């Protein structure tokens, strides 16, 4: 396997019935041509590959926007526990704090475009969120914010996004597979990458359309039901009444509290209850990303 580091995509030179050729360039501006059976485009929301194919959507800025910063010297409960805050003015967005090592956390918030706050207001809103009593208390009085914040758009429209073209398969943010309820996209990106590999293997020595159709079928099977479920729940969470009702249900017992987090961050698929083909023996029992607290 040949691995090229420090290179970037330039353009799609040609597509033929049996291969695709692309131009790439290195950090020292040295150009090179690469030929392969397929290109898997994992190049983000703004996908230069998609743009090269003339498939970009003018004016598209994503469904969500996220804002994040790291902090250290955390002494409150956020040091060891995952926190999710459903602030009334952020709904259906939310704020989060993920514990890291040595008293550090990843803390931030996300908003749905078209909500109460614009993307341009996120920077000014940040100090206000950090000063709110319950958030400040979770971090502790000695918390130190690190470096600068980062912000980025989140594409979450897998049911309408282009997934393939010719001998190109789009995955991850390039395929807009991000969860439309939480904005989480790492797991979705990994899964879409696996599905693209399965589709290519299934179409070996056959027309490109076989691989494209297989990939789109796999994406539909693995993402569409979850996307629709997330969109429905997002509508409910837009109101404070809906959010309170959902949290009351989640807070009924230690079991519901524990599995709400597993479900929200998709240790199990979002719509798993309605897609029996994805049930398995250890359903809701396997370990997630964070330690269980009863």
Predicted regions: what they are:
Residues 198-294:
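C-terminal helical "tail/cap" subdomain of flavin- and related membrane-associated enzymes
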Residues 42, 60, 118-123, 161, ...:
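Generic structural signal for well-ordered, non-membrane alpha-helical segments
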Residues 1-139, 155:
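Predominantly flavin-linked oxidoreductase catalytic cores and closely associated redox partners
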Residues 7, 43-44, 194, 240, ...:
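Alpha-helix N-cap/helix-start capping motif
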Residues 11, 24, 111-113, 135-136, ...:
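FAD-dependent flavoprotein oxygenase/oxidase catalytic domain
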Residues 1-4, 165, 218:
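Domain-scale detector for complete catalytic domains at protein termini or as standalone homologs
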Residues 67, 80-82, 150, 159-160, ...:
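Glycine-rich, flexible loop/turn motifs
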Residues 7-11, 115-200, 205:
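FAD/FMN-dependent oxidoreductases across multiple families
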């Amino acid at each position: 396997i040949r691995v090229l580091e420090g290179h970037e995509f330039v353009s799609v030179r040609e597509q033929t019935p049996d291969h695709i050729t692309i131009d790439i360039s290195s950090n020292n501006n040295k150009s090179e041509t690469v030929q392969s059976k397929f290109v898997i485009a994992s190049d983000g929301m703004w996908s230069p590959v998609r743009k090269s194919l003339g498939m970009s959507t003018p004016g598209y800025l994503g469904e969500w926007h996220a804002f994040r910063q790291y902090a250290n010297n955390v002494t409150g409960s956020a040091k060891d526990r995952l926190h999710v805050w459903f602030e009334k003015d952020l709904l259906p967005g939310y704020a989060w704090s993920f514990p890291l090592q040595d008293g550090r956390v990843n803390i931030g918030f996300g908003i749905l475009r078209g909500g109460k706050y614009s993307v341009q207001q996120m920077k000014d809103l940040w100090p206000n969120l950090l000063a709110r009593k319950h958030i400040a208390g979770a971090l502790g009085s000695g918390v130190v914010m690190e470096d600068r914040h980062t912000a980025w758009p989140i594409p979450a429209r897998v049911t309408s996004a282009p997934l393939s073209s010719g001998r190109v398969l789009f995955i991850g943010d390039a395929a807009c597979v991000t969860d439309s309820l939480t904005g989480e996209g790492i797991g979705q990106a990994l899964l879409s990458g696996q599905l693209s590999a399965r589709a290519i293997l299934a179409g070996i020595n056959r027309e490109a359309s076989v691989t494209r159709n297989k990939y789109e079928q796999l994406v539909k099977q693995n993402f569409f039901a979850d996307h629709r479920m997330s969109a429905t729940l997002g509508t409910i969470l837009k109101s404070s009444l809906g959010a309170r009702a959902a949290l009351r249900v989640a807070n009924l017992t230690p079991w519901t509290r524990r599995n709400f987090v597993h479900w929200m961050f998709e240790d199990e698929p979002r719509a798993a209850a309605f897609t029996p083909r994805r049930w398995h023996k250890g359903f809701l029992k396997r370990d997630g990303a964070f330690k269980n607290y009863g």
